[in-house]
Structure formats: C-alpha cells, structure tokens
Design a protein with these regions (language model features):
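Active-site-proximal beta-alpha core segment in soluble small-molecule metabolic enzymes
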Residues: 11-183
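Positively charged, low-complexity intrinsically disordered leader regions
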Residues: 1-6, 10
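Active-site anion/phosphate-binding pocket segments in diverse small-molecule metabolic enzymes
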Residues: 33, 49-50, 68-71, 75, ...
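Secondary-structure boundary/capping motif
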Residues: 6, 60, 107, 255-256, ...
Length: 315
C-alpha cells in the first residue's frame, strides 16, 4: 500500500504515515518500524503518549503530534516530538514550557482551518502568531498544514478546490512572514489520488496504508493489512421453534444447525450486526449472524455449510 501511494507522488515529496489509535487498531510499533524501513519520512499520532510508544519501539524519524495537550508538553519535548499547534493559547503555553525547559528553536507545525472547522488557526490570526513567534527563540515554525474535508467526494470538488486556494494563500503569507522555507502539507489519502497537483512538500496517509482508499478504483490497488478471525467453538442442532440467544430474537422455522463463535461486543461487534443483518465467512461461504450479539460470543447459521468445531471463521 505504501509503495502504491508513494508511486503517486513526486520523488522529492515527503511521505507522512499516520499511525494514530494504535495504527488504526493494529500494532503501532510494528507498523511504524516496517514503514520506517520502507523509507517513510514522517509519522503522525494523535497524542504525545502514542509518540513516546513509537520512540520506545525504535522509531527515529520525526513524529508529529496532531493533538498536543498542555499536560503532556514536557513529555513531548523530552521525546523530540513535533506538535501541531492550532490555537494561540496552545502556542503561548508551548512556548512557555519550551522556555522553562531551556530549549531553543524547538520545531513546531502550525495548523490552519481552511474549512473542516475542527481544529486550526484562522488565516486572520497569522499576524498575531507572528508576534508571538518573533518575540522568543524557544520555538521555531518549520511547517504549515491544514486538513481537507472531502477529497474522496467528487461532488465536493469545488469545496476542496476552495480549501486548497485558502491554504495556498496562507502558505504564501507565512513564507513572507517567517522568511524561511516552510514544510507544507495538506493532502490525505484520497487527496493524493484525486488532487496530485497539491502535493506541496509532504503528503499524509492513514487509512490508505491499511488498505482502504474510499473509492473502488483506489481500493483495487490496495490490500487490507488486517483480518479478524476466530474459530467455531461449538455446533448445535436446533429443532424447529427453538430460540437462540438473549431475548429470543431468533427462532428457527425448521431444523437448524448453529455454530457459536468466541467473540462479540468486547471485540467491537455491536448488537447492530446481529439478527441476520451481517455475515461471517467459512471456507468462502457466508453464514448469517443470528440472534443478539453477546459480550464475547455470537451465533451463526451453518445449516448449509460443511464445517466442524475448530474451523477458521473470517469476520
């Protein structure tokens, strides 16, 4: 997946891999180490403790913290993590912490809101940011970023183009303000595919690295990196008229063979997946989840599937 996405950008464009939330629910250290070996230039995490985990696992390339919090500024600095600063209060607090730690020109990224309306400075705040930056030497702005709202949606091309126009204007003003070459990054996975002209100096990819590109044409080039599997714990022959599971939400119309699988709510399979709404796969055949999903068990209908206790099941 990395090689495919890498092939879509210019050789000189840096690649940032997003490994927040335990690398999207997998293994952040293992994923990051592999990507570091492949040549990834940067990593991004949501919180400082995730960055510390990567450093402890042997990651040496720069790590961007997308949601830096005042309580963790010292840990962030101690582990050479780069904060994405998105408000004047966060900027002021981080400068103060950096001064207290006695550091000079600590690298920071400035995040601007161009339309997602989640986190970020407004363009109008740039003069105030400049004053804060130029009256100290504890931190140094090295990058400008923003986040696009709908790069995967072809119906939102006009809005994405507007966001890119806003970002471009901010970048030009920032270059003039700080008088240095700033690293600029705005594209996400779908942006890499649909807006290649806006690569700037670096692109960011999260979901694409794990095998999903938000569009069938992209997904066909990607491979999901994880599969949830279990085994059949027990099979039952259920007579017609018998119920299965809590609240008797399934009643057999005829003699039915069921299989119980040892996973459920605790593994992220909510009740909305039960009562025949979704399926699991056994030897390439689909079996519906019947009844209510339990905390650590689900029941499936295997009446027409040849299978045995201990057989592998793909969720």
């Amino acid at each position: 997946n990395y090689e495919y996405l890498r092939s879509k950008i210019k050789p000189e464009t840096k690649f940032l891999a997003v490994v927040k939330a335990y690398a999207y629910g997998s293994d952040a250290q293992a994923i990051a180490l592999h990507l570091q070996d492949l040549g990834v230039d940067y990593f991004a995490v949501a919180y400082a403790n995730e960055g510390v985990h990567l450093r402890e696992g042997g990651i040496t390339v720069p790590i961007l913290v997308l949601h830096p919090q005042k309580a963790h500024f010292k840990v962030l600095i101690e582990n050479n993590l780069e904060p994405s600063i998105y408000s004047q209060s966060i900027l002021s607090d981080f400068i103060l912490t950096a001064q207290e730690r006695g550091v000079k020109e600590y690298p920071i990224h400035l995040k601007f809101n161009t339309g997602l309306n989640r986190l970020g400075f407004s363009a109008e705040e740039l003069p105030d940011i400049s004053k804060l930056i130029h009256h100290q030497d504890a931190v140094k702005v090295i990058a400008i970023l923003s986040h696009l709202a709908a790069t995967e949606d072809n119906n939102e091309t006009a809005f994405t183009t507007l966001q890119l126009k806003r970002f471009d204007a901010i970048c030009k003003e920032a270059d003039a303000t700080f008088k240095i070459k700033l690293l600029k990054h705005v594209l996400n996975t779908s942006g890499i595919i649909n807006y290649p002209h806006a690569q700037y100096d670096m692109v960011r990819s999260g979901i694409g690295l794990y095998g999903y590109g938000n569009h069938p044409n992209v997904d066909s080039h990607l491979i999901p990196v994880a599969t949830l599997k279990t085994i059949i714990a027990q099979k039952h022959n259920i007579p017609a008229g018998e119920s299965v599971g809590y609240n008797r939400k399934y009643t057999s119309n005829s003699e039915t063979i069921t299989a119980t699988l040892p996973l459920g709510h605790a593994d992220g399979i909510g009740r909305e997946y039960g009562q025949g709404k979704t399926f699991v796969s056994i030897s390439g055949q689909l079996a519906p989840i019947i009844g209510n999903v339990c905390m650590d068990m689900i029941m499936i209908d295997v009446t027409n599937i040849k299978c045995s206790e201990g057989d592998e099941v793909i969720i």
